[in-house]
Amino acid sequence: MNIPNIAYKGNLAKNITAEDDYYQSIAYFKTIEDFIDESSYSRFVKAVENLVRTSTDYKAFIDYIKNTLGLDFCQVFSKVSDQYATVEFHHGPIFTLYDICEVELTKFIKTGQRINTFRVADSVLDLHFSMKINGVMLCKTSHEMFHNQDIFINVRQCIGDVNTYIKENSKYFNDEIKYKIWNYMHLCQNDSFDNGGLDIDTVKKYIKPIS
């Protein structure tokens, strides 16, 4: 099946060119120059985020959490189950899905990998299935309470090995993400009984404080 007026050119640059106008060409892979503009950078990360959320693999991951791990209930209000209310996977309490996609894009750039939304999204999904992404099951009420900072989510309530994720990806964190980690660590030490869920020594070793 052919897409009307579109011809795929299988060269190294991986360009898709309009048949009726050779000069109308869209590169299949992105270059570093494509991310110089902040708005273009943000649009790309959001596109990756959307691709992850809407993928069949992500739906399979959520199904695994609910039906294999048995986490089909709110981990704040444990009596609220998926049977009676919508219970969703919330990325956090430190890294949002946008953060994770952004870190993966930075990794692709710094390691010289070919970049497009599909490749970065695949890498993000691999992190989910390797259980390195921190997340917690929340109902609508607890989700709103978390975003309003009415409740504190402890990493011990979550699935995913956040300490390994930090150790393996810290060199790709920007200052905003580093600040999030240090701020959460401060809350753990001063406003909550973290009980070692977040490995403070790991954070201090791999993440320098933001001045």
Feature-to-residue mapping (PLM):
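Histidine-centered nuclease catalytic patch
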Residues: 79-134
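Residue-level detector of alpha-helical secondary structure
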Residues: 163-170, 204
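The −1 position to Zn-ligating cysteines in a subset of zinc-ribbon hairpins
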Residues: 73, 88, 138
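Short, non-ligating residues that shape and space the ligands of small metal-coordination modules
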Residues: 83-85, 145-148
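Cys/His-coordinated zinc-binding microdomains
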Residues: 77-79, 140-143
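Short cysteine/histidine-rich metal-coordination sites, predominantly Zn2+-binding motifs
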Residues: 89-98, 154-164
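A boundary/linker detector
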Residues: 1-83, 96, 172-211
